[in-house]
Amino acid sequence: MQNNKVQSSDADVTFQSSDNVDFRLHKRYLEFATGGFPPANTPSSLGEIVRLSESSTTLDILFQFVYPQRHPSLDKLGFEELLKVAEAAEKYEVFGALTATHLMLRCVSKFLHSHSKQVLQFACVHRVAPLVERLAPIMMDTPLSKIKSALILCPSYFVEWVSTLDH
């Protein structure tokens, strides 16, 4: 179900999801709430549609973080949905969504335990140190051979990880 704010009739930019759902947004809000979209005064063709690779479900949640309103609750999202929103937040630098998804990944115990390798991969790819720190004690018994592909993405995390395991 799409939020009315991301379907504004007076919007000046249209994004289309991978499943062909259009999202009409205001450039001025994108400019202030993100780092991954051009400034509001950037010229664009009338009626231009910007195609994005994410699904409408992911974009609907993500774009709600762009507007000056109460942000959506992520509590009911499953791990895969949350990770998709987190990846999109990183890609488009949607600041509110970055904070919310990082917090959910760091604080929801069931995700940390049941999807620890995926969370570690995300944390290393996007350089989210608090997530790596949170995972270290949880994954203490995981052989380094099983997680080195994630840790190698950021050597400084690898050093910290090994130091944590020594204590």
Model feature map: region roles:
Residues 90-93, 127:
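Ankyrin-repeat interhelical turn detector
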Residues 101-167:
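Acidic, serine/threonine- and proline-rich low-complexity regulatory tracts
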